[in-house]
Amino acid sequence: MNEPDRKPRLRRRVRRRAHRVLRRAALWTLRPLRWRRVPPPGERLHVRVLLQNAHGTGGTIRTVLNLCGPLTRDHDIEIVSALKGNPKPFFPLPAGAAVTYADDRFAPKGRTARLLGRFPSLLIPAEESSFRYMSLWTDVCLLRALHRTPCDVLIATRPSLILLAAELTPRGTATIGQDHMSLESYQPPLRRQVVRAYRRLTVLSVLTAPARAGYEAALAGSGVRIVRIPNASPPLPGRPSRREHEVVLAAGRLVANKGFDLLIRAYAPIAAEHPGWTLRIFGSGLRRERLAALIAELGLTGRVELSGFTRDLHGEMARASIYVLSSRREGMPMVIIEAMGMGLPVVSFDCPFGPPELITHGHDGLLVPTGDVDALTAALRELIADPGLRDRLGEQARRSARAYDLEHIGARWSRLISGLRPFPPHDFTGKPEKSRRIPA
């Protein structure tokens, strides 16, 4: 590495280490917030759900909003969005749930808010991907949202918010961390903070068996209850695909992890062999121009389409015959469950950790080694050339997707929350109480 490259990396490491020191100091200063009184629960538990941006477009946002709908039948659900990052929600907000915004980016700001908004967050780890969207003013707003009124159960839905819940939630409130990835997917500095803080949770919910095994090893002896509850798929609109259109479909953010560069390269031989077929990639992101250049370089203009965002992905699935996922790493991708529910056979890299749990190779889809472009080409070629195989895998995929029905998964979550009712008696002395654990 030459000297000009080394200096920016050194400065970045120094900044991140300084931020970690300041973050620990801030958390230590805010510890008295955990000693506040929390009233006993009523007949219906007040459940507060922390979300990054309720108006965003990510898979985590969609799954959390979907889940909150059924939970309102048994509990009082309040969704607290750390940010209001867009004027209108992309996904429908659940009826019956209260939605509040900690930091409304579209509301008029006073002098203090404008000043603090210029400084980076102290409560969000610099290694967490949401750090760039947060500010010192967001920290203040989140603390207000957490402590203005008590709740019985607090559910946090991404690492930055789970850390906040574990470290600053008042004692007597049950905390559930809903981790949509896995411990191994985080950078080492963030991983260390996760292991240290997650020990204070009441329950940690993960999506896959490997993720559960990883956390059980890392949190051994902590007493945290670790459960595996997969994502749920809402009822799908319209009719499923009849697999008659010559379209291969992919969707996701145009970022490196989604592997669309590998998919485009894998599709190049298919375009020559089957000129009637088209690959459509839905989504937007920082790599759009780079992917467009790759399409032009490989002579795939008109054969591979970067179709941008769509609010009707299910409709696009109904007009496709194959779904393909080329990610280098995934949690439990909702889009696979939805594609299977729409009757599409799915071709996916066998990446950690979700796809191997969702797809049974040769039964309801095809799995190929992660990053193997030639194997991905061969799997797509096999499905395109064999309509009978497409139909057999697609029909079985619909049956497999029923295991992720929203009503079924919602009932599991409701039982989990209700089981936290006898959470520790509240200590009204104003002093921190000793940790008490709920049996697994």
Q: Where do the language-model regions lie?
A:
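N-terminal strand-loop element at the rim of the active site
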Residues: W28, R34-R44, L50-T57, P70, ...
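A conserved mid-protein helix/loop that constitutes part of the nucleotide-sugar donor-binding site
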Residues: G58-N66, E246, A250-A272, L279, ...
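Donor nucleotide-sugar binding/catalytic pocket of nucleotide-sugar-dependent glycosyltransferases
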Residues: G177-H180, E184, R199-P237
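Aromatic "clamp/platform" in nucleotide-sugar-dependent glycosyltransferases that forms part
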Residues: F309, R328
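Short hydrophobic beta-strand element within catalytic cores of glycosyltransferases
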Residues: P345-F349
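Conserved acidic donor-binding segment of nucleotide-sugar-dependent glycosyltransferases
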Residues: T360-G362, L366-V373, E382-P387, R402
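A short, well-ordered alpha-helix in the C-terminal region of glycosyltransferases
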Residues: A375, E382, L389-A403, R415
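C-terminal alpha-helical cap of glycosyltransferases
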Residues: L406-A440
